[in-house]
Amino acid sequence: MSDFAYPLHEECGVFGIYDRAGTEDVAAAAYSALYALQHRGQESCGIAVNDDGVINGHRDLGLVNEVFTPAVLGSLAKPTAHMATGHVRYATSGSRIRANAQPMIVRHGRGTMALCHNGNLTNALELRRQLENEGAIFHGSSDTEVICYLVTRNRLRMGSIEIAISKTMDVLEGAYSLVVMSATKLIAARDPRGYRPLCIGTLPGGGYVFASESCALDLSLIHISEPTRR
């Protein structure tokens, strides 16, 4: 049988950048990183940008170069933007619809966050049913939306986004990696067993880059020093 008998896919790919110096075009960096991670997911993609605390983004079905035309990418490029997240999706759970594309942006009573997720939750259906019984309304069918609801609920109850993510991870079962962007912070996390890959790079001007694979660090148009695999 040919090596190319099956479609190319590698689950999903996540990316995040925090540019402390504010000298990089973080939207362009996210685009280049997603292009490098395209082999991990070909169904949909998205980028969210933090422009001085205001989070906006674009996501849709299609390949990176199809979804992010020069006009779309230009609308995300802001001189004061210092953080961005990005995602390429191959559906391991949920349908192939735009509502399942990432990053998912949530606006709640304590602010706004954008969340990217790679992996699978073995208790996603159980968590979804619990949330629906509490009044949650889901627009898609992915595990990621379940995680978004849990982080949001915990953020409304807890003192920080870090604690909210930690409390959420206490009830998640499965293999996953996360990149979460709030108005002031960029946070990356993995399941306790570290099954899903996540690389970390540092920026020479100060800041960090997170990605599912080191190829995204090499091709994100940023000089990466000391990339390490976590």
Regions found by a protein language model. Name each.
Residues 1-221, 225:
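Conserved short alpha-helical segments that host acidic/polar catalytic motifs at enzyme active sites
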Residues 226-230:
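Short "domain-exit" segments at the C-terminal end of structured domains
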